[in-house]
Amino acid sequence: MAVEMFYDDDADLSIIQGRKVAVIGYGSQGHAHSLSLRDSGVQVKVGLKEGSKSREKAEEQGLEVDTPAEVAKWADVIMLLAPDTAQASIFTNDIEPNLEDGNALFFGHGLNIHFGLIKAPENVTVGMVAPKGPGHLVRRQFVDGKGVPCLIAIDQDPKGEGQALALSYAAAIGGARAGVIKTTFKEETETDLFGEQAVLCGGTEELIKTGFEVMVEAGYAPEMAYFEVLHELKLIVDLIYEGGIARMNYSVSDTAEFGGYLSGPRVIDADTKKRMQDILKDIQDGSFVKRLVANVEGGNKELEALRKANAEHPIEVTGKKLRDLMSWVDRPITETA
């Protein structure tokens, strides 16, 4: 099914310019949205809790900062860009008491709305504007006169103005320069979670660790295994990112290409596909989100245990030692990287 696309000519920037926008959060996406909205002539304030380390940075960049409750009270469009697991409490404590008829509540990801963790009043527009790139790229492209493609979706539209407002917002952060894709909260949420779990984070991580274990258990040096299954992955991913799988296969040696065709299906086979389908079902039926919420309510104990076990894997020890030799690699912000 073909997607519906919009560009700058389809967007009316004056719509968002006539509104007051509160951006809750000043992380990767929050800073990009806030600065680009401001540069597009939009009234914007940033909402941060008292004592936030991001407050000074936002103020240094010329933005007005107040508590989430105060900016929600001031604004008529509220973009909630805090972490997924913090959004429900922020909504309940700071946003919901300050919502008025005709306000709009926007998100950068659909999880909390799609799975019913946040339920906005019926007289509030609920929408999503989600750039398909990290915040630093969104901001850099905007400054360069370009843009990162965005997704927009409307879940609740009491006045019938939601799509025009979302499209205007997307244009204000540069998205309509590249292209805006219309989707739904369901589609964005479920595809995003599946991609993260089965391929980008979970799947790739386990593939790397298992490859490392197979080589080391066969008697190869951990350093050699690290280079072959982790370090060189960036070279392959960059080629795929730039031109797709065909570009990657064109660029590698015939030996690598031929071996990949023969062995890839032995690693990822019909049984793997079945398990991936099971992962998708767990996402669709809410099982994953229930476990996510239980983890948060339990003080993040399950996440911390998984994080600790992952950090202690031998590939992390080997990797840190080797990366210390690589002057061109940016130093990590975590103790284990």
Swiss-Prot record:
Domain KARI C-terminal knotted intervals: 184-329
Binding-site residues, NADP(+): Y26, G27, S28, Q29, K49, S52, S54, D84, T85, A86, Q87, G135
Organism: Mycolicibacterium smegmatis (strain ATCC 700084 / mc(2)155) (Mycobacterium smegmatis)
Binding-site residues for Mg(2+) 1, renumbered to this chain: D192, E196
Pathway listed: Amino-acid biosynthesis; L-isoleucine biosynthesis; L-isoleucine from 2-oxobutanoate: step 2/4; Amino-acid biosynthesis; L-valine biosynthesis; L-valine from pyruvate: step 2/4
SUPFAM superfamilies: 6-phosphogluconate dehydrogenase C-terminal domain-like, NAD(P)-binding Rossmann-fold domains
Active-site residues per Swiss-Prot or TrEMBL entry: H109
KARI N-terminal Rossmann domain ranges (all copies): 3-183
Membrane-spanning intervals of the chain: none
Function per UniProt: Involved in the biosynthesis of branched-chain amino acids (BCAA). Catalyzes an alkyl-migration followed by a ketol-acid reduction of (S)-2-acetolactate (S2AL) to yield (R)-2,3-dihydroxy-isovalerate. In the isomerase reaction, S2AL is rearranged via a Mg-dependent methyl migration to produce 3-hydroxy-3-methyl-2-ketobutyrate (HMKB). In the reductase reaction, this 2-ketoacid undergoes a metal-dependent reduction by NADPH to yield (R)-2,3-dihydroxy-isovalerate.
Cofactor binding notes: Binds 2 magnesium ions per subunit.
Name of this protein: Ketol-acid reductoisomerase (NADP(+))
HAMAP family according to UniProt: IlvC
Enzyme Commission number: 1.1.1.86
Keyword entries, A-Z: Amino-acid biosynthesis, Branched-chain amino acid biosynthesis, Magnesium, Metal-binding, NADP, Oxidoreductase
Gene that this polypeptide is encoded by: ilvC
Ligand binding (substrate): S253
